[in-house]
């Protein structure tokens, strides 16, 4: 509800502003905190300018379904399908880029996560050890992935060792760091923060791939600029995102296969 009020307030400000009406872009905290959003905003020259809303993927997708946003970039494939694609709210679907999730935690690694064979096993070891784990707990793409990993591990997290922060990726990682706890992290965001005592303990599983997809939202009054932005973002914008590097010099993001495709209305 708070997000919708904020987006509606943006609309009021747009109506009071002279010049082109801004394009309403909704995206996630990991896009913002990994520097990918700053890259897009700095290179997009319009017209029109961007009016960007940042929130967890679940909130962004619901706002898009309500018609409050024109373009979204999210990283929760199952939620995207359920909230945007299946009901017919997506006009255009464009694979953008992918990063990687990792299990981070204390250097002592009491749950022996670093020697796990799979991400599910890493989560199972955390539960077996009763080691503290900090979750975002906010219906973000990161939280959705985490829940899927607990399910794959056959584990229901227990309150005595499991804490939901209810906040963004950066704040969650800082909280986990303070408590010597494990957490699921988007690698580019973790790298951008720097200065954390937490270490990357496990990332070697294709289940930890983190795909970002851009959607042009189907609206009663479509904004032609939304398609223009989508084309730009998946070409020049994407190349700039792919140029971002982790501290070890490896790419922070890799290319997502596939081109923009019209999403049929059911």
Question: What feature does the model see in each segment?
Answer:
Residues 50:
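Hydrophobic anchor at the start of a short beta-strand
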Residues 1-7:
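Bacterial N-terminal signal peptides that target proteins for export
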Residues 18-47, 58, 62-68, 76-77, ...:
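Exported/periplasmic ABC-transporter solute-binding proteins
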Residues 10-11:
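Processing junctions and N-termini across compartments
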Residues 70-71, 91-103:
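Short, glycine-/small- and polar/acidic-enriched structural segments
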Residues 84-92:
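Hydrophobic/aromatic-rich structural module bridging two neighboring secondary-structure elements via a short loop
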Residues 14-15:
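C-terminal motif of bacterial Sec signal peptides marking the signal peptidase cleavage site
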């Amino acid at each position: 509800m708070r997000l919708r009020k904020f987006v509606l307030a943006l609309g009021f400000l747009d109506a009071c502003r002279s010049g082109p009406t801004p394009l309403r872009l909704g995206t996630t905290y990991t896009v913002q905190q990994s520097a990918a959003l700053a890259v897009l905003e700095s290179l997009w020259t319009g017209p029109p300018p961007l009016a960007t809303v940042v929130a967890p993927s679940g909130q962004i997708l619901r706002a898009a379904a309500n018609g409050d946003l024109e373009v979204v970039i999210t990283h929760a494939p199952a939620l995207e399908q359920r909230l945007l694609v299946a009901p017919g709210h997506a006009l255009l679907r464009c694979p953008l880029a992918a990063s990687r999730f990792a299990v981070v935690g204390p250097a002592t690694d009491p749950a022996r996560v670093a020697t796990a064979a799979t991400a599910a096993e890493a989560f199972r070891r955390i539960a077996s050890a009763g080691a503290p784990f900090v979750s975002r707990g906010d219906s973000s793409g990161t939280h959705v992935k985490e829940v899927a990993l607990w399910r794959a591990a056959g584990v229901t997290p227990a309150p005595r060792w499991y804490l939901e922060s209810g906040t963004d990726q950066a704040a969650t990682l800082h909280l986990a760091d303070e408590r010597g706890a494990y957490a699921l992290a988007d690698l580019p965001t973790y790298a951008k923060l720097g200065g954390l005592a937490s270490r990357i303990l496990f990332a070697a599983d294709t289940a930890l791939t983190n795909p970002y997809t851009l959607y042009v939202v189907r609206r009663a009054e479509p904004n032609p600029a939304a398609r223009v932005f989508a084309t730009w973002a998946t070409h020049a914008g994407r190349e700039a995102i792919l140029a971002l590097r982790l501290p070890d010099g490896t790419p922070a993001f890799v290319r997502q296969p596939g081109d923009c495709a019209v999403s049929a209305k059911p």
